[in-house]
């Protein structure tokens, strides 16, 4: 049997997993704050998409820039949907993997820039301020997580270095460390 992952669990499960993917853009706290983190990032991303479509129609001279932002937002959205579809057959928290953080993070960067530049006047300072407050609040937990990940990587690298120095053959290195 060549199947690696479980079959998709359906549209609603795929959308849930896609929102989980987007929630990871907040780092590890996005996992802790699920499902609110997914709703937060999903709504902001949808709002940015709507603002971009409005800018496309109302600012023809800005269409190249708007198209670029739409491409980035669309790419992250496509990653979220593809991950949602591909992982929805796994457990209920399959989309909340830390490895998705760097793939999902550009969505919030685009949200920040798009709302600050093209958004309605009332939101131009409110949304960036809210995002600043959220990221300031999450900075320390994310920093602690990164420090711990660095320590773990250093320990694994030290074991690997000892095995190489001891003359362990490549096939055993692969079997032990991969």
Language model region names:
Residues 1, 54-58, 113-117:
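Hydrophobic alpha-helical transmembrane segments
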Residues 8-17, 21, 32-46, 98-105:
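Alpha-helical transmembrane segments of polytopic membrane proteins
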